[in-house]
């Protein structure tokens, strides 16, 4: 790229900092009012940026906005990583309008809206640079996966809002950097989810009890993987739990820092359990679980 595209500025890092650290370092070099974050496996459409910037420009309280994210390989379906905007359930499990766990919906314009969400996908979002920097950007310790949910949660605790618009559409290949079945992806997802909860959760029940419930449910998930023959996936969950435990000191420090951001806006949070609805009540879509 350096030899053939001299017009493109490149930034060389000494080691792989992952999605979170890599973006932080790159965005430090940019002096702009807005950042547009786009994964390398995204295919954009014509005039997709203006609808995003227009929303940010005209709304002081909105920090970030996500376009509609459809699958690059199955273009009439939503894509796993973001779909039509992210939410979290009663136990802080992330899911999306258009994608609940592994069930991905056909795009029938059912989510052609301008709506508030809990988190915008790291695969593609626009965000105000000032707000990004105020909350410290992505948590580099996450490396990859759920760092955007953690970021949006901190922004919401600052009193800001996260939105989705269907006026902009992109296509995402998904799993282009790390396959969905990768043990490393499993490890990062489970570890980072616990980290995110420890840093940001403020609820009616004590944090410790909340974490114990989540670890118990994680272990059930690990047992399911083991019984299906996925030993590596099961061990990845065990490893994630150990990593969480040895990180508690650092997480407590971060939690104390972020406790100053005490607005605790939970729009985009649902008091329903996605697990109960999906696995026991067989409700597979966002509308069935939360309502439109």
Feature locations, PLM:
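Acidic donor-binding segment of Leloir-type glycosyltransferases
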Residues: 1-12
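Short aromatic/hydrophobic "clamp" motif used to bind/position activated sugar donors
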Residues: 35
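Active-site-adjacent helix/loop segment of glycosyltransferases
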Residues: 158-273
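A recurrent flexible, glycine/aromatic-enriched loop bordering the glycosyltransferase active site
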Residues: 90-96, 101-127, 149-151, 178-180
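Acidic metal-phosphate-binding loop of nucleotide-sugar-dependent transferases
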Residues: 17, 42-43, 69, 142
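Glycine-rich, basic loop-to-helix element that forms the pyrophosphate-binding segment
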Residues: 12-30, 40
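A short, conserved alpha-helix in the catalytic core of glycosyltransferases
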Residues: 112-169
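Conserved donor NDP-sugar-binding/catalytic core segment of glycosyltransferases
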Residues: 43-93
């Amino acid at each position: 790229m350096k030899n053939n595209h001299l017009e493109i500025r490149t930034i060389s890092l000494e080691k792989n900092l992952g999605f979170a650290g890599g973006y932080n370092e790159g965005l430090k070099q940019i002096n702009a009012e807005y950042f547009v974050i786009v994964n390398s496996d995204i295919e954009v459409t014509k005039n997709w940026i203006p609808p995003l910037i227009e929303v940010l420009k005209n709304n002081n309280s909105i920090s970030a906005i996500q376009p509609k994210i459809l699958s690059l390989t199955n273009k009439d379906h939503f894509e796993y990583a973001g779909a039509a905007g992210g939410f979290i359930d009663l136990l802080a499990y992330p899911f999306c309008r258009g994608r609940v766990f592994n069930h991905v919906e056909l795009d029938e314009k059912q989510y052609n809206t301008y709506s508030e969400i809990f988190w915008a996908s790291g695969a593609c979002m626009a965000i105000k640079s000032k707000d990004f920097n105020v909350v410290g950007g992505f948590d580099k310790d996450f490396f990859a996966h759920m760092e955007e949910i953690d970021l949006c949660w901190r922004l919401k605790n600052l009193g800001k809002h996260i939105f989705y618009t269907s006026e902009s559409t992109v296509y995402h290949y998904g799993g282009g950097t790390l396959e969905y079945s990768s043990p490393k992806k499993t490890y990062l997802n489970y570890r980072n989810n616990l980290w995110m909860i420890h840093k940001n959760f403020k609820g009616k029940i004590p944090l410790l009890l909340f974490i114990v419930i989540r670890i118990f449910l994680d272990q059930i998930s690990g047992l399911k993987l083991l019984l299906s023959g996925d030993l590596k996936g099961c061990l990845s969950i065990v490893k994630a739990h150990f990593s969480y435990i040895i990180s508690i000191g650092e997480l407590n420090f971060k939690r104390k820092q972020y406790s100053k951001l005490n607005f605790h806006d939970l729009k985009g949070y649902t008091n329903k359990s996605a697990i109960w609805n999906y696995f026991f009540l067989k409700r597979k879509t966002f509308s069935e679980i939360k309502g439109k």
